[in-house]
Amino acid sequence: MSSHPPIRSYVLRQGYFSHAQRHAYESLLPRYGIPFSENPIDLDSIFGRTAPKILEIGSGMGETTVEIAAQHPEKDFVAIEVHAPGIGSLLDRIEKHGLTNLRIIPHDAKLVLQHMLTGESLDGIHIFFPDPWPKARHHKRRLIQSDFVSLLCNRLKPGGYLHIATDWEDYAIHSLHVLSSEQRLINTAADYAPRPAYRPLTKFEQRGMKLGHTIRDLIFTKAA
Ligand SMILES: C[S@@+](CC[C@H](N)C(=O)[O-])C[C@H]1O[C@@H](n2cnc3c(N)ncnc32)[C@H](O)[C@@H]1O
């Protein structure tokens, strides 16, 4: 029997580390990172309190992640990212903002959701501007696929939300189809949702808008 390697939603590049990112990656990961493990973790004991838990998949350089966490001290946030300079950048921002409600798991989100987060434990999941993988032969690498959305749904509490934003029209159409096909999810809008106040406009997004790209938000809730 041949076993196929898993299809990844990312390619690990060497990437350029700024001095601050490298320093943060090396010195702050033990403080704000949650190491990958094949065993379930208890987020309430990691944060030292019971509070709503929001997961962000693919936090990139962490600008949005930190802004949202700083504006919502009443909630706890867990970011998942695989790109080392991005992890360093987020760690540096957590330290500079003195945030106690944001941690990062530096690993593949699929494995984190399968092994570390169990049960219906999340109040919300953010996936902002996932890699679009525009070529047809790469579509299988897209994060938003029915199996993955089913896994996300398993981890959401009843009434919890899944929020995706993208500036790629065809990825938005694909995601709308996949989310609408998951029976446990209910669209909060007729199709795309207005950008909620908690999602700040990023520089990347403002640049896209100048180029005429339309940003689409999809916000679905899990049936109670
Ligand atoms: C296009 S970037 C968007 C970053 C950020 N959300 C933003 O809006 O600027 C997508 C990010 O998702 C990360 N990513 C892709 N697949 C992932 C996975 N399976 N687990 C964790 N991170 C992933 C990539 O490393 C990349 O940083």
UniProtKB/Swiss-Prot annotation:
InterPro entries per UniProt: SAM-dependent_MTases_sf, tRNA_(Gua-N-7)_MeTrfase_Trmb, tRNA_methyltr_TrmB_bact
PANTHER family attached to this UniProt entry: 3-DEOXY-D-MANNO-OCTULOSONIC-ACID TRANSFERASE/TRNA GUANINE-N 7 - -METHYLTRANSFERASE, PENTACOTRIPEPTIDE-REPEAT REGION OF PRORP DOMAIN-CONTAINING PROTEIN
Species: Nitrosomonas eutropha (strain DSM 101675 / C91 / Nm57)
Domain of life: Bacteria
Binding site for substrate: K135, D167, T202, K203, F204, E205
Protein name: tRNA (guanine-N(7)-)-methyltransferase
Residues the record lists as binding S-adenosyl-L-methionine: E56, E81, D108, D131
One Pfam short name: Methyltransf_4
Pathway: tRNA modification; N(7)-methylguanine-tRNA biosynthesis
Gene Ontology cellular component terms for the protein in this record: tRNA methyltransferase complex
NCBIfam families: tRNA (guanosine(46)-N7)-methyltransferase TrmB
Active site location: D131
Enzyme nomenclature, EC number: 2.1.1.33
HAMAP family the UniProt entry points to: tRNA_methyltr_TrmB (MF_01057)
Recorded name of the encoding gene: trmB
UniProt keywords, alphabetically: Methyltransferase, S-adenosyl-L-methionine, Transferase, tRNA processing
Transmembrane segment boundaries: none
Record's catalysed reaction(s): guanosine(46) in tRNA + S-adenosyl-L-methionine = N(7)-methylguanosine(46) in tRNA + S-adenosyl-L-homocysteine
Function: Catalyzes the formation of N(7)-methylguanine at position 46 (m7G46) in tRNA.
Family from the record: Belongs to the class I-like SAM-binding methyltransferase superfamily. TrmB family.
